[in-house]
Amino acid sequence: MSEYPKKRKRKTLHPSRYSDSSGISRIADGVSGIFSDHCYSVCSMRQPDLKYFDNKDDDSDPETANDLPKFTDGTKARSRSQSCLVPSPVLRILEHTVFSTEKPADVEICDEECGSPESGHQHTHEESPIEVHTSEDVPIAVEVHAISEDYDIEAENNSSESLLDQTDEEPPAKLCKILDKSQASNVTAQQKWPLLRANSSGLYKCELCEFNSKYFSDLKQHVILKHKRTDSNVCRVCKESFSTNMLLIEHAKLHEEDPYICKYCDYKTVIFENLSQHIADTHFSDHLYWCEQCDVQFSSSSELYLHFQEHSRDEQYLCQFCEHETGDPEDLHSHVVNEHARRLIELSDKCGSGGHGQCSLLSKITFDKCKNFFVCQVCGFRSRLHTNVNRHVAIEHTKIFPHVCDDCGKGFSSMLEYCKHLNSHLSEGIYLCQYCEYSTGQIEDLKIHLDFKHSADLPHKCSDCLMRFGNERELISHLPVHETT
């Protein structure tokens, strides 16, 4: 006879019961009407709802080591704190069933057939058998190898907490200690990071934005990088930083009394000279553009161009040759050039813009019969269409433009070119009024502005410079500045 018994092939009409997701296998054949007739391997079964706290026959406790009963093979029974948890349906079956301590032959064959590496570490002869407590609190040592066919597989997905609620027994003390430690660690993390909480989907979501992640470390890094304020003690008005919040509060009281506010930013000051210097250095350090209609200043030509368009919306321009009306001077000029080019040339000659007498510009338009072209004799422009040559002369040689510079008299057909031209006059110098936002490129214009705009509130004028003062005492204190120079 061989050392190992011959393996018996299992035949069944239900192969799915041999999968790893099945329950616990049968333990005895003598009970009919409760268990299935098939034999299942307990070694290959996954039991996610059973949490083992196995101490491997821990005899360290002298009080309980000698009181525990022993089995026929010399294995000690486990105490209540060492017992394992099994599903409640199995407990209800086992409470009303009497089992024999002898191991049936079917179970031996089943144990021999289980040779999977997954089950090798779960149940061996050296391990203690699973202990199941009945309602009478008597430890009965049995090996659980069977499960009822009526057992619901969904019960396997229940957590260990729900299994504890189903049983009338108190949970083991060791399990309570483990849960307390995990809860304590979670509370500590939530206290440190109150905004980081896992939602129902298992994702950690930031309460300050839409960011979410399944990792706590990613959300923690996101909060530090995106929402943690490192410059909390910085003044919003003057951008000055302070070491404490109390110093920032004391500093903020100074800005409540600031009478001078920059219209281009949030800068405030109690000294007007500081405001004037701030405007010149910050907003008009390189270029200065101002509107001649309302004296509003801009730091770029594009801003001035947009500002001019606002003025053009309020005004309506009427064509003098027809009833065309528009709010944009460029649109009016384009209309006159395209529709009334010949009449515009005649008007230019009458005003002497051409410089060669009446109809001088019209006489410059000739027709080349050899090449069948209309040619401009002023610049050589040519085209097969007479209207194209008339449009060219009206645009380039009539010197009638929608925008004309007041300083040099040069005209421009587009507002953007006109705004860029204003930069050429800034080389002579920029003169800013120290008492308001007025600026000009001519020193005489600034003097006239000071005499008319600030003579009432600042009647005392310095004879050596353009400074004005509200009282005579301030003027006297200012005069030593010129004596030292």
From Swiss-Prot:
Residues 371-455 are annotated as: Interaction with CTNNA2. It is found in: Nucleus. Keywords: DNA-binding, Isopeptide bond, Metal-binding, Nucleus, Phosphoprotein, Repeat, Repressor, Transcription, Transcription regulation, Ubl conjugation, Zinc, Zinc-finger. Residues 1-23, 54-82 are annotated as: Disordered. Signal peptide: none annotated. Residues 1-14 have a biased composition (Basic residues). The keyword Nucleus applies. It holds the Pfam family zf-C2H2. GO terms for biological process: negative regulation by host of viral transcription; negative regulation of DNA-templated transcription; positive regulation by host of viral transcription; positive regulation of cell growth; positive regulation of transcription by RNA polymerase II; regulation of transcription by RNA polymerase II; symbiont entry into host cell. A zinc finger (C2H2-type) spans 204-227, 233-255, 260-283, 289-311, 374-397, 403-425, 431-454, 460-482. One of its GO terms (molecular function) is RNA polymerase II cis-regulatory region sequence-specific DNA binding. Gene3D superfamilies: Classic Zinc Finger. The modification Phosphoserine is found at residues 60, 88. Its main location: nucleus. Interacts with CTNNA2. Belongs to the krueppel C2H2-type zinc-finger protein family. Binds DNA and may function as a transcriptional repressor. This is Zinc finger protein 639. It comes from Rattus norvegicus (Rat).
